[in-house]
Amino acid sequence: MAEKFDNLEEHLEKFVENIRQLGIIVSDFQPSSQTGLNQKLNFMITGLQDIEKCRQQLHDINVPLEVFEYIDQGRNPQLYTKECLERALAKNEQVKGKIDTLTKFKSLLISELGKVFPEEMAKYKAIHGDDPPS
């Protein structure tokens, strides 16, 4: 899978470099540079065809639209991954806190119910085990 991405990256780098050179030729166009311009245009077409071939190999890859928004805003797309991981970590900590609170509540509830309803709690503990989770 990595070689597919490497192949695409290589073709994209070549394409961008060709476009850069094409821009230089066009910005200072002289009739004598027509042959070079035609050659660069043909390279551009070939580059697009190569990229299209790579696209067909990567058709099953899904990229979140937010990544493209980051790129459009001039931001590093790796920041998207970092921020997603940070949000997941924060949510994980929040859920862990809720679980810990509910576990403590269950333990306290079992303890208090044992004081009020000792016979019923003895049956409960016989079915579910003597040690409530703490």
From Swiss-Prot:
Belongs to the Mediator complex subunit 10 family. Pfam families: Med10. Keywords: Activator, Developmental protein, Nucleus, Transcription, Transcription regulation, Wnt signaling pathway. Component of the Mediator complex. It is found in: Nucleus. The keyword Transcription regulation applies. GO terms for cellular component: mediator complex. This is Mediator of RNA polymerase II transcription subunit 10. The keyword Acyltransferase does not apply. GO terms for biological process: atrioventricular canal development; cardiac jelly development; heart development; regulation of transcription by RNA polymerase II; Wnt signaling pathway. PANTHER family: MEDIATOR OF RNA POLYMERASE II TRANSCRIPTION SUBUNIT 10 (PTHR13345:SF13). Its main location: nucleus. One of its GO terms (molecular function) is transcription coregulator activity. Disulfide bonds: none annotated. Signal peptide: none annotated. Component of the Mediator complex, a coactivator involved in the regulated transcription of nearly all RNA polymerase II-dependent genes. Mediator functions as a bridge to convey information from gene-specific regulatory proteins to the basal RNA polymerase II transcription machinery. Mediator is recruited to promoters by direct interactions with regulatory proteins and serves as a scaffold for the assembly of a functional preinitiation complex with RNA polymerase II and the general transcription factors.
